[in-house]
């Protein structure tokens, strides 16, 4: 699905980048990981590190503060101060990706040699 994601990103004047925190293994902890193991391709959309009006360092500080103080804690709740504009953009990207996949003549599949090319159960 990399080509689909890259095409959508180009059409939306965005760029695709590698996972900035691969050591966290978020794909392997995701809800769609069992599908990948069964041979069903999936993607993970995540926030980037280009924040409108803020530096990369600001974004990293926000991530670290939330992750250390609130992630999977009783305080892990929505806040009125959150800015959802980026989430709207992610939804638009996901919709465009879904549309492109639905127009494909064949179902998506993993490329030979990909980690999940051979389904496991």
Locations of regions flagged by a protein language model:
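Secretory-pathway/membrane protein signature
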Residues: 1-121
């Amino acid at each position: 699905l990399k080509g689909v994601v890259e095409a959508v990103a180009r059409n939306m004047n965005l760029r695709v980048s590698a996972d900035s925190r691969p050591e966290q293994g978020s794909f392997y902890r995701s809800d769609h990981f069992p599908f990948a193991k069964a041979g069903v391709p999936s993607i993970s959309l995540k926030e980037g590190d280009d924040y409108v009006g803020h530096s990369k360092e600001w974004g990293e500080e926000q991530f670290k503060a939330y992750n250390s103080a609130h992630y999977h804690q009783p305080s892990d709740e929505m806040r009125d101060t959150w800015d959802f504009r980026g989430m709207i953009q992610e939804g638009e990207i996901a919709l465009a990706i879904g549309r492109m996949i639905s127009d494909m003549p064949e179902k998506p599949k993993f490329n030979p040699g990909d980690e999940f090319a051979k389904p496991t159960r």
